[in-house]
Design a protein with these regions (language model features):
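Walker A (P-loop) ATP-phosphate-binding motif of ABC ATPase nucleotide-binding domains
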Residues: 4
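Hydrophobic anchor at the beta1->P-loop junction of P-loop NTPases
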Residues: 7
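P-loop (Walker A) phosphate-binding loop of NTP-binding proteins
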Residues: 10
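ATP-binding Walker
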Residues: 13
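Walker A/P-loop
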Residues: 16
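Conserved substrate/cofactor phosphate-moiety recognition/catalytic segment
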Residues: 20, 24-65
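Glycine-rich phosphate-binding loop used to anchor ATP phosphates in small-molecule kinases
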Residues: 51-98
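A glycine- and Lys/Arg-enriched "phosphate-lid" helix/loop adjacent to the NTP-binding pocket
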Residues: 89, 94-139
Length: 139
C-alpha cells in the first residue's frame, strides 16, 4: 500500500491549493473532491450536473487503486470505513470564516464574472452556495 494524505478544511480554507502544492512536491497524484462530484460536462456552469455520493465514492476508490501515492483534498473526506485505511496522514486547515467567505466569493467571481452578480444568470445559484458555505459548522 502506498501513502495517502488527506487535506481537510471548509470551503475557502485553501485545501485544494495546499493539496496541489503538496502533491507536486512529493510527486503524488492529486485528487480533488470537487472533481469527483462535478464532472466537467457544462462549460458554462461546471456545477450543473453533480454526481451522487455513491458515484463520487466509486470514483475515489478507482483513483486510489490506480494511484497508490496520492493527496486528496476534501472538506471532510467522509467516505466510510472502507476508505480510511488508505489515509496515512491528515492535514486539517482552519481558517477564519470571514477570510474563507471572501475567498469563496472571489473564486466565484474569477470563474463566472458578472454572471454571479445581481442580475446575472448564476446569481441565485451562487448566493445559495454562499449561504450554505457560511452555515457550515466549523468543527
Amino acid at each position: 500500500m502506498g501513502t495517502g494524505i488527506i487535506v481537510c478544511g471548509l470551503n475557502g480554507s485553501g485545501k485544494s491549493t495546499l493539496g496541489k502544492a503538496l502533491a507536486k512536491r512529493l510527486d503524488f497524484y492529486f485528487i480533488d473532491n470537487e472533481d469527483l462530484y462535478f464532472p466537467k460536462m457544462d462549460n458554462q456552469y461546471p456545477y450543473a450536473s453533480p454526481r451522487t455520493y455513491e458515484e463520487a465514492k466509486n470514483l475515489l476508490f478507482h483513483e486510489i487503486k490506480v494511484h497508490e501515492n496520492f493527496v486528496f483534498a476534501s472538506v471532510k473526506g467522509n467516505y466510510g470505513k472502507e476508505i480510511s485505511p488508505f489515509f496515512q496522514l491528515v492535514v486539517l486547515i482552519d481558517v477564519a470564516k470571514d477570510v474563507r467567505m471572501q475567498r469563496v466569493r472571489s473564486r466565484s467571481f474569477q470563474k463566472f464574472g458578472n454572471r454571479m452578480l445581481p442580475g446575472g444568470d448564476l446569481y441565485d445559484q451562487e448566493e445559495k452556495f454562499f449561504v450554505f458555505v457560511e452555515s457550515r459548522a466549523e468543527n
